[in-house]
């Protein structure tokens, strides 16, 4: 389970600044309310794992539905809002019944549930594969979509806590041994290049 960001083992941490909760940047002002499922953990086919095998692997899912719930508050009728139980069960069913061949297929499938099964006007999903890369905590993808396609969208590929050994510094004693550096890599818009190749180019 991804419990947070750990410190570098030795002296320093090189970090590419990012916002882990991207909904604070992409949400639309006309939809002030959010219904979320956080860190749903499933096992499913989601592409190759860190050893190049096409086998079920752990997948962590965050899903956010953006809406306006004032009508439900006034009427006290559940049909006027979005049911997080419906979202949760649909995501679990998707994981159990679907064999995806890539990370982006998982993300698009979850987004389809948010917009078309749960009828959210705007949604975000964040998918993490904690066993996708040997030298990183996770590979992931963040998508933001509007049902009517009028709001801004986001496609972002993420590599979290990529561990790299590198020579740091210009002094002679600093160049005798490599130091451990931990890097977060975000690519936006998401590239078609596999995250394995991106991680290898950094590593």
Map each language-model feature to its residues.
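N-terminal, polar/charged subdomain of small-to-medium soluble alpha/beta proteins
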Residues: 2-203
């Amino acid at each position: 389970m991804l419990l947070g960001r750990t410190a570098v083992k030795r002296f320093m941490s090189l970090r590419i600044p990012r916002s882990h909760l991207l909904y604070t940047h992409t949400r639309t002002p006309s939809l002030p309310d959010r219904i979320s499922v956080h860190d749903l953990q499933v096992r499913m086919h989601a592409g190759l794992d860190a050893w190049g095998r096409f086998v079920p692997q752990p997948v962590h899912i965050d899903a956010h539905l953006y809406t306006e719930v004032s009508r439900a508050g006034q009427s006290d009728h559940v049909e006027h809002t979005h049911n997080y139980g419906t979202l949760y069960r649909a995501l679990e069913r998707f994981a159990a019944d679907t064999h995806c061949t890539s990370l982006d297929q998982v993300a698009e499938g979850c987004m389809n549930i948010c917009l078309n099964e749960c009828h959210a006007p705007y949604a975000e999903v964040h998918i993490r594969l904690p066993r996708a890369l040997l030298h990183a905590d996770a590979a992931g993808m963040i998508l933001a979509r509007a049902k009517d396609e009028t709001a801004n969208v986001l496609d972002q590929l993420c590599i979290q806590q990529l561990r790299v050994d590198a020579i740091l510094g210009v002094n002679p004693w600093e160049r005798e041994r490599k130091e451990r550096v931990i890097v977060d890599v975000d690519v936006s818009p998401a590239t078609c290049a596999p995250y394995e190749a991106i991680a290898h180019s950094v590593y």
